[in-house]
């Protein structure tokens, strides 16, 4: 009986580890004004295709600013953007790889900041913005 309980306990732990939601941004760095940079957010631990994905940034010394959102297949992959971006940013996603991309063009000094991806809506509003990546720093400077 003890052996069976141990087995159940180990399986439960492994299941918890394997199902842990993870988001990991990459692609940041030093970028010259007017250039382009593409950020990526690799995810795991959930059914990526079910969820909307969000990008949020934080400029030095400022609060969080919502950047953009891309919805899921059920919502035709529609993307929405913050007004300050003026068509310079483009969101895309690859459901087969569970990755969301943020293409940033004609980058400006005011785009400097830490960029975070976050899991958005997936059918339950209480799950919105619960999971975040660690962020990737974009520094715009000549």
Curated annotation (Swiss-Prot):
SUPFAM superfamilies: Immunoglobulin (SSF48726). The keyword Metal-binding does not apply. The mRNA was isolated from an IgE-secreting immunocytoma that arises spontaneously in LOU/C/WsL rats. GO terms for biological process: immunoglobulin mediated immune response. Gene3D superfamilies: Immunoglobulins. It comes from Rattus norvegicus. Residues 20-133 form the Ig-like domain. InterPro entries: Ig-like_dom (IPR007110), Ig-like_dom_sf (IPR036179), Ig-like_fold (IPR013783), Ig_sub (IPR003599), Ig_V-set (IPR013106), IgHV (IPR050199). This is Ig heavy chain V region IR2. Residues 1-19 form the signal peptide. The lineage of its organism: Eukaryota, Metazoa, Chordata, Craniata, Vertebrata. It comes from the Eukaryota.
